[in-house]
């Protein structure tokens, strides 16, 4: 026999979007005693509708929380049906996953409370040992107590120690002062770490003092047409390929500053190649009449005056130690950076200075230069075969500039 089915149309009278009722979902259901009270709480700062249900009576507690995973995928409503109008009112009703907990089974143990007694367990143990222990045990307890440090008695001593340390360390340099001392001890010209252009990293006045720069007069070199006669006006005659090649490109009055740098470079090369000379008079004999103020400035910055030497400055003795040798070389490289527009080939320069390329690379890195294999564009500019470009080292300067840290190395072969 078939079952007859009827279909009724029900009108949705209203829908309440804001939660106005909540449904507690208890496993297998339950029947709450009449003395049970329930409270519903909502999290104020939560963007979602999150609720907490709490109820209790004399023996039981009821706890419920909004199921966030279920809430994200499902939406629950409670419908209030009006049979006369055949309409229904829908109320949003979050479901709270709930459970019943017996008060007798809850762990109501509170935090551990420290004993008010100041007696240490070891003190109690020692008291028993002194009362009932052997002579050997009593002696060990007495030695232990005699050597025990009482922190309370050390409070005043600790204050005195701190005051003594402060007094002793007040004259020690600060971190900034130590950085300044380290910077001054570097073998490089004074660097401008805030430079926004590569020319500002080692400005010319940090390489050649302004007072000395004005004594480098190169107008006669600029006016001279014959190249050999031009080279004869430089302070050191060593047939430098670099000086001769660079001189060909400095022919305009606007290049006067670079010509002054080239002149000073020639003088530094002369001092470096005669670094075993230990007397100013002998040094001047090997140079081509440079202004004496330039020589005095170089000797004051790049040499160590021998102790016990008195008399005229022209006759004084000095020596150039390994640190000052590196300092002269760093100044030479800084000048060459300016002359070569801050892109320098390592190999020809190493031949010019009679140094190993690795030594030149390490000095450039002390200056903060970046040393890498030549790029395709650089290889084309310098006429380097593409097959060897990656191993052909080029030194460049870039901004922002970071001053490299100085590291101490063990003594070893210099070159």
Swiss-Prot record:
Subcellular localization: Nucleus, Nucleolus
- Matching InterPro entries, A to Z? RNA_pol-assoc_fac_A49-like
Which GO BP terms apply?
A: nucleolar large rRNA transcription by RNA polymerase I; regulation of cell size; ribosome biogenesis; RNA polymerase I preinitiation complex assembly; termination of RNA polymerase I transcription; transcription by RNA polymerase I; transcription elongation by RNA polymerase I; transcription initiation at RNA polymerase I promoter
Which Gene Ontology terms of cellular component type are present?
Answer: nucleolus; nucleus; RNA polymerase I complex
Gene, per the UniProt record: RPA49
What the record says about family reads: Belongs to the eukaryotic RPA49/POLR1E RNA polymerase subunit family.
Q: Which residues lie within the region annotated Interaction with DNA?
A: 322-415
Protein name per Swiss-Prot or TrEMBL: DNA-directed RNA polymerase I subunit RPA49
User: Mutating residue 359 to A: what's the consequence?
Assistant: Loss of DNA binding
Which PANTHER family would you find in this protein's record? Answer: DNA-DIRECTED RNA POLYMERASE I SUBUNIT RPA49
Which UniProt keywords are listed? DNA-binding, DNA-directed RNA polymerase, Nucleotidyltransferase, Nucleus, Phosphoprotein, Ribosome biogenesis, Transcription, Transferase
Q: Mostly located where?
A: nucleus
Question: What single Pfam family name could you report for this chain, choosing any that match?
Answer: RNA_pol_I_A49
Report the protein's function.
Answer: DNA-dependent RNA polymerases catalyze the transcription of DNA into RNA using the four ribonucleoside triphosphates as substrates. Component of RNA polymerase I (Pol I) which synthesizes ribosomal RNA precursors. Besides, RNA polymerase I has intrinsic RNA cleavage activity. The heterodimer formed by RPA34 and RPA49 stimulates transcript elongation by Pol I. Subunit RPA49 can bind both single-stranded and double-stranded DNA.
Q: How does it assemble?
A: Component of the RNA polymerase I (Pol I) complex consisting of 14 subunits: RPA135, RPA190, RPC40, RPA14, RPB5, RPO26, RPA43, RPB8, RPA12, RPB10, RPC19, RPC10, RPA49 and RPA34. The complex is composed of a horseshoe-shaped core containing ten subunits (RPA135, RPA190, RPB5, RPO26, RPB8, RPB10, RPC10, RPA12, RPC19 and RPC40) where RPA135 and RPA190 form the DNA-binding cleft. Outside of the core, RPA14 and RPA43 form the stalk that mediates interactions with transcription initiation factors and newly synthesized RNA.
Q: Name one GO molecular function term.
A: DNA-directed RNA polymerase activity
Look up what happens after changing residue 358 to A. Answer: Loss of DNA binding
Q: Which residues carry this modification: Phosphoserine?
A: 34, 151
């Amino acid at each position: 026999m078939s079952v007859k089915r009827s279909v009724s149309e029900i009108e949705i009278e209203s829908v309440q979007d804001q939660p106005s009722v909540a449904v507690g979902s208890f496993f297998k259901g339950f029947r709450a005693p009449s003395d049970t009270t329930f409270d519903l709480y909502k999290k104020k700062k939560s963007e979602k509708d999150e609720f907490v249900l709490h109820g209790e009576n004399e023996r039981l507690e009821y706890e419920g929380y909004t199921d966030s995973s279920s809430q994200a995928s499902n939406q629950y409503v409670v419908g209030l049906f009006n049979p006369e109008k055949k309409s229904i009112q829908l109320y949003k009703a979050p479901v709270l996953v709930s459970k019943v907990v017996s008060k007798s089974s809850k762990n109501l143990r509170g935090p551990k409370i420290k004993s008010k007694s100041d007696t240490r367990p070891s003190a109690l143990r020692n008291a028993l040992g002194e009362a009932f222990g052997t002579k050997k045990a009593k002696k060990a307890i007495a030695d232990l107590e005699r050597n025990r440090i009482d922190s309370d008695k050390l409070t005043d001593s600790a204050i005195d120690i701190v005051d003594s340390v402060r007094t002793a360390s007040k004259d020690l340099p600060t971190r900034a002062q130590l950085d300044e001392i380290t910077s001054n001890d570097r073998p490089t010209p004074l660097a401008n770490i805030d430079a926004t252009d590569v020319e500002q990293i080692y400005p010319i006045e940090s390489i050649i003092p302004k007072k000395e720069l004005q004594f480098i007069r190169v107008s006669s070199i600029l006016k001279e047409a014959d190249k050999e006669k031009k080279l004869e006006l430089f302070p050191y005659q060593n047939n430098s390929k670099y000086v001769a090649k660079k001189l060909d490109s400095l022919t305009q009055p606007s290049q006067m500053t670079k010509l002054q740098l080239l002149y000073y470079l020639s003088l530094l090369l002369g001092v470096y190649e005669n670094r075993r000379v230990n007397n100013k008079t002998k040094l001047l004999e090997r140079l081509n009449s440079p202004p004496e103020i330039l020589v005095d400035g170089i000797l004051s910055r790049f040499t160590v005056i021998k102790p016990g030497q008195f008399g005229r400055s022209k006759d004084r003795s000095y020596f150039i130690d390994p640190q000052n040798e590196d300092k002269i070389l760093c100044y030479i490289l800084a000048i060459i950076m300016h002359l070569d527009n801050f892109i320098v080939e390592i190999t020809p320069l190493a031949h010019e200075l009679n140094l190993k390329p690795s030594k030149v690379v390490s000095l450039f890195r002390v200056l903060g230069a970046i040393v890498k294999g030549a790029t395709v564009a650089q290889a084309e500019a310098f006429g380097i075969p593409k097959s060897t470009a990656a191993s052909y080292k080029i030194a460049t300067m870039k901004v922002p500039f970071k001053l490299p840290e100085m590291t101490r190395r063990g003594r070893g072969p210099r070159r």
